[in-house]
Regions:
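Catalytic alpha/beta active-site cores
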Residues: 2, 77-78, 82-399, 406-413, ...
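Generic recognition of stable, solvent-exposed alpha-helical segments in well-folded globular domains
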Residues: 8, 12, 16, 27, ...
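Generic, well-ordered alpha-helical scaffold segments in large soluble proteins
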Residues: 12, 16, 20, 35, ...
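Acidic, glycine-enriched catalytic cores built around paired aspartates
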Residues: 77-81, 85-138, 142-149, 153, ...
């Protein structure tokens, strides 16, 4: 640890900051560390006060529920109002400038990617455009009849071509006939011309859908660009490819504008427990903004180097030059107020507030983009987009706004350059969402919902009221539907339409694309102009929903409806333990134990913060700390209320450890648990998450995970 400006700084982090982060900006190392020291001195006590207020509120709520159980909504509302938890509604109107169209105007999928895996981050950044042919060919989006042939399977290819033709007929219909009849696509002064054997030549039913083209070269390669609902679709023409040869109009691919925005995550999807980990995470964010991030990997026996894609060049319909971004617009998610990091310590040995460090590093990295120091531009509007999670109520949002203002002042940035995305994932924020938005009215560019974290906080808030519903039953509760509807209602009432994102949560089954196509269209239909997906392929398939649904039109309709009743958020999701059969209890305990262990063993034992973890039935689910929080809180709640006992929990976890080990058999570096449960850091961490769940502030998992991961790293 190096002593810098009165701070003890981990050598990995110091080397990154001084050798990379500050390499081409007008900020010295002394100034950076002095700024961090001032921010820590100013905000750490305020953050500590906010966390103490959380604990005070929770203690009072616990006491009330012990006396009243779930109580009535009327009694609960009065109590929470008297407590200062439930605040008067506000009627804010946001006034935010310098917002990129990807956030303000273009509805579309949003990726969330761990910052600790540069290859994944590059994949996400480049997922602005995705191959529909690949997405259809390689997933269950199209039913598959038998095994695919090695190499290119022409039967499957024909199936993909037919599906693409049908999609084009639906979304970009011709004035007459079908895209299946096309023999050639070309541009003319009158727009798109499609040659067909049956009808001669024909144009689009709506000529305004033609956006541009790339001229056909000597080998017959070119492209046609179409647009619908703000998104673009490219018909790629290349008769020299295997697919183009098979296609009836020499089409090699249909490429969709897909992941319009991407959140580069420093929080729930990463395992960053020291300065080395933090430097890795920050390096990814910096490299994306500078445009020099690369990742090498082996593919087909060769070393492949991946880097960010360039912009895409076309000739517009009017003959002018047209440049479209080749990369997703990137936001960065910082840590919440409750987290600290040992990467930097104060003179008395205290860890600094991780969110303060994140904000400063995120903004300094943003200077490279704001000052045009890289080959590409992220924010053409001149903003840095920071998503702030785990905030409890408007006072904490106001604290973040003040922090961002202090960072701007220190770096000489215009006021409100640092925009804020508000994660609506804690109950005190949900019930006071209008007041939260009011505190950030000049910065807010995003609110979203997330079932898992929000349910985790719901469980912890009502922990002493009684045994909570099973995890699956939570999805049909009144409070959850109200939460999803009200988030949209409040945001639109505050003027988010055509200015900011209203987001919905993650599709958690990366392999279940047919199911996603069927179900996730509900998000744009609910008024969300962005929703989370687990992969670039999922982004391409989810983009179909935004091509089908006019989200701006949906938002206009929703804006005229009555705002969902806030009182319905106060219905406490508890049940009578006697209504749960022994089989129900066993299945729920086994399911959650397996989920907890499957995630924790990767986090603690392997340093993986987000991955596809098979559930008890073997279905791969995208897991991060949010999924862990709800599972650990549910089991802890049932333990407290006697639905299960400690011995049963321990026995179940021991059995499930063997199941998880078997599911991961053969994976390089996997630290098996069942052979020695007592010495397994991962197994002991999983048990601690349950047995300390009642006492852990807000039911968060980070402190337990971090401590056990640090032990595992030290022992490695």
């Amino acid at each position: 640890m190096a002593d810098t400006a009165g701070l003890q700084v981990d050598e990995h982090l110091r080397s990154f900051v001084e050798g990379e982060l500050l390499s081409d900006v007008d900020l010295t190392a002394d100034d950076f560390w002095a700024t961090l020291a001032r921010l820590q001195e100013r905000f750490a006590p305020r953050i500590a006060d906010a966390l103490a207020r959380r604990d005070e509120i929770q203690a009072r709520i616990d006491e009330w529920h012990r006396e009243h159980g779930a109580g009535s909504v009327e009694e609960y509302e009065k109590f929470l109002t008297d407590l200062g938890y439930l605040l008067p509604e506000k009627s804010p109107t946001i006034d935010v400038d310098r917002v990129d169209p990807e956030i303000a105007e273009v509805p579309g999928p949003q990726l969330v990617v761990p910052s600790t895996v540069p290859r994944y981050a590059l994949n996400a950044a480049n997922a602005r455009w995705g191959s529909l042919f690949d997405a259809f060919y390689g997933t269950d989006a199209l039913p598959q009849d038998g095994e695919l042939a090695k190499g290119y399977d022409e039967r499957r290819g024909a199936q993909v071509i037919t599906a693409a033709d049908e999609l084009l007929d639906e979304l970009f219909p011709l004035a007459k006939g079908s895209h299946a009849d096309a023999t050639a696509y070309r541009a003319s002064a009158d727009g798109l011309v499609v040659d067909t054997g049956a009808t001669g030549t024909v144009g689009l039913a709506d000529p305004a859908q033609f956006a541009g083209f790339r001229p056909v070269d000597g080998d017959g390669r070119g492209a046609v660009l179409l647009t619908r609902n703000g998104l673009h679709l490219e018909i790629t023409i290349d008769p020299t490819t295997q697919v183009g040869t098979q296609h009836h109009a020499d089409v090699a691919d249909v490429v969709l504008e897909s992941a319009v925005t991407t959140i580069v995550d420093l929080e729930d999807s990463v395992a960053t427990v020291d300065g080395e980990d933090k430097a890795l995470a920050y390096r990814t964010w910096l490299g994306l903004l500078r445009g020099d991030l690369t990742a090498e990997f082996r593919k087909g026996g060769k070393t492949v180097t991946r880097r960010v894609n360039p912009d895409r060049e076309y000739t517009a319909a009017d003959g002018s030059d047209l440049t479209l971004p080749g990369r997703s617009l990137m936001l960065v998610r910082n840590c919440g107020h409750h987290m600290t990091t040992n990467a930097v310590r104060t003179t008395d040995g205290a860890e600094v507030a991780e969110g303060v460090l994140d904000a400063l590093v995120s903004a300094v990295a943003g200077l490279y983009d704001l000052q045009g120091k890289g080959p590409h531009t992220n924010s053409r509007a001149g903003s840095v987009y920071i998503v702030k999670p785990k905030q409890h109520g408007p006072e904490e949002v106001a604290l973040t706004v003040e922090l961002f203002g202090a960072v701007e002042e220190a770096l000489g940035l215009r006021a409100n350059t640092l925009k804020i995305g508000i994660m609506d994932e804690e109950k005190r924020t949900t019930v006071n969402l209008s007041a939260c938005i009011a505190e950030a009215a000049n910065r807010v560019i995003f609110v979203n919902t997330g079932f898992l974290d929000r349910t985790g906080d719901e469980i912890h808030t009502c922990f002493t009221a009684g045994p909570v519903l099973r995890k699956g039953d939570m999805k049909s509760t009144t409070w959850l539907k109200t939460y999803e509807d009200r988030n949209v209602d409040v945001a639109l009432a505050a003027g988010f339409a055509h200015t900011a994102q209203v987001g919905k949560g993650m599709w958690a089954k990366p392999a279940a694309m047919a199911e996603m196509i069927e179900q996730k269209i509900g998000h744009p239909k609910a008024g969300a102009n962005c929703a989370w997906v687990p992969s670039p392929t999922a982004a391409t398939l989810h983009a179909l929903h935004y091509l089908r649904v006019d989200v701006h039109g949906v938002q206009d309709e929703i804006a005229s409806r009555a705002t969902a009743d806030r009182r319905k958020l106060l219905e406490v999701p508890v049940t009578d333990a006697s209504s749960l059969s022994a089989q129900d209890v066993t299945h729920e305990l086994e399911t959650n134990a397996q989920s907890i262990l499957g995630y924790v063993v990767r986090w603690v034992g392997m340093g993986i913060g987000c991955s596809t973890v098979p559930d008890l039935e073997g279905v791969g689910l995208m897991e991060d700390r949010a999924t862990l929080r709800i599972s650990a809180q549910l089991v802890a709640n049932w333990l407290q209320h006697g639905v299960v006992d400690e011995g049963t929990v321990r026995d179940t976890f021991a059995r499930m450890a063997a199941v998880v080990d078997e599911q991961n058999a053969g994976e390089d570096g996997y630290p098996a648990m069942a052979k020695d449960l007592e010495s397994s850091e991962s197994f002991q961490a999983a048990l601690e998450l349950v047995f300390s769940g009642a006492a852990e502030p807000n039911g968060y998992t980070e402190r337990t995970l971090t401590r056990w991961r640090q032990r595992a790293k030290a022992a490695a």
